[in-house]
């Protein structure tokens, strides 16, 4: 029995090395959460092994639980350390934390039903201490699952706002927006914007770096059925500025010719930028951009000589 369980244990650890697709932020969050139940199972297997090896040697029940917990933590740390040596996997402290919390929760829950726990420790199998442990396990489980729940709602909110891609009006939509070599803030529109229905816009400060700008990661992916992409950009600068709009699909090979790239001129004042989706679809060389699988939208400046600021809003399809 013990050799068989040891084999199962190493099989559980080996699951961490199986390539799992993480093509979306939500799927990556779920894959990360899976460390929680996986190492809960590892801890239970280690507890059983400690019991089989320890009872004949007089190990206390507390020692058995302690060895199971320490063993799970060590295995989690070793697996993360080995992943740091791999070019295809990345070690993350958050994964190790989920390993630890998973082991704590499953061992704690099991202890409230474990008849081997006797004496003073037996109070943990009785009310109210048993219920207190159960409440703690539920709280820790929900905490571990919180990232998945947050991204699940963010995806629902993204779908509800479509065909708007970004209005800079919600903390949920801003989860998908990242600044690179720039600073992004949600601010009231400048006085010259001239649309009283707009409460907030995005202010982007472009630093004098190589490609400062903003990136919308995973906008609503299916753009079929629409004809135009638009964005409003307001400039308080006295001179014109140049930006580049870049759009990738899920099949992008990271080559310049395999995506949509369009330089646009930003004049002083309000600029309504409108682009036909047919132009976007036909942009890659040798293939068509997949309008059912849009992956990224970017706005950036190419090596600006100095810092400057623009206001962006109303990124949408029509």
Segments and roles (model prediction):
Residues 138-318:
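Beta-rich carbohydrate-recognition modules and glycan-binding surfaces
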């Amino acid at each position: 029995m013990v050799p068989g369980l040891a084999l199962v244990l190493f099989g559980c650890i080996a699951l961490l090395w199986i390539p799992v697709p993480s093509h979306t932020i939500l799927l990556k969050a779920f894959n990360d959460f899976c460390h929680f139940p996986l190492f809960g199972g590892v801890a239970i297997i280690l507890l059983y092994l400690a019991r089989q090896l320890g009872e004949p040697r007089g190990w206390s029940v507390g020692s058995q639980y302690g060895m199971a917990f320490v063993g799970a933590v060590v295995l989690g740390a070793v697996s993360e350390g080995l992943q740091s040596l791999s070019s295809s996997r990345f070690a993350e402290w958050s994964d190790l934390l989920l390993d630890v919390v998973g082991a704590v929760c499953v061992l704690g829950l099991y202890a409230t039903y474990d008849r081997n726990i006797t004496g003073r420790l037996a109070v943990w199998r009785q009310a109210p201490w048993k219920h207190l442990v159960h409440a703690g396990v539920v709280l820790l489980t929900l905490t571990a699952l919180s990232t998945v729940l947050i991204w699940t709602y963010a995806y629902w909110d993204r779908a509800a706002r479509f065909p708007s891609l970004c209005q800079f009006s919600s903390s949920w939509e801003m989860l998908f927006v990242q600044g690179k070599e720039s600073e992004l803030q949600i601010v009231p529109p400048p006085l010259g914007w001239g649309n009283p229905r707009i409460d907030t816009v995005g202010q982007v400060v472009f630093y004098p770096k190589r490609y400062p700008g903003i990136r919308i990661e995973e906008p609503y992916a299916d753009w079929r059925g629409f004809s135009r992409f638009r964005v409003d950009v307001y400039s308080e600068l006295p001179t014109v500025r140049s930006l580049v709009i870049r759009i990738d699909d899920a099949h992008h090979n990271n080559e310049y010719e395999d995506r949509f790239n369009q330089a646009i001129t930003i004049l002083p004042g309000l600029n309504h930028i409108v682009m036909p989706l047919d132009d976007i679809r036909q942009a890659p060389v040798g293939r068509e951009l997949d309008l059912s699988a849009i992956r990224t939208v970017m706005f950036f400046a190419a090596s600006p000589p100095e810092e400057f600021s623009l206001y962006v809003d109303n990124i949408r399809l029509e």
